[in-house]
Amino acid sequence: MKNIIENEKYKLEIFDDLNPCSPREFDNLGTMVCFHRRYMLGDETELKSSDFSSWEELESYLYKEEDALIAIPVFMYDHSGLWINTTGFSCPWDSGQVGYIYISKEKVRREYSCKRISKKLKKMIREMLCSEVDLYNDYLSGNVYGFTLTDKENAEEIDSSCGFYGTDYIENGIFDYVSSYFT
């Protein structure tokens, strides 16, 4: 995919980032534990699918052994591409649960320098974990972009960058980089 946006002086070309970094390599708040027979998804952990007989058993383990504050189910849709979310998909044939994203109480206390975890903080963390899944979904489904900005008068490249996750160029940050050229 390539989108071109121009004014009298500049040309912005937005293209697919063909070699993006997995957002699970970033400094994430949550840990994503996923099991699938064909795909290596989520974060590397010591846990194995053979250690659990059901998703409920894994969830129980996360709350009891990992002292999870929150454990949110992660679902995958696999049909001519991969998509994940925390709400599930309507197609029963090509979709199902693949794991959980969770955070321990200890990590919350360490990251937020708090002893007591308020309902407000817990709600904010839940939203952040869901956002991590959304970002990973953009990566898995190929919604990562780059751009080049060119001066049309002399064909000189002014700026370029890659690694913008998501299809909304305002939300993903591309227009933050180039907005001064298009005002």
Q: Language-model segments: what does each one mean?
A:
Residues 1-183:
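Acidic interaction surfaces
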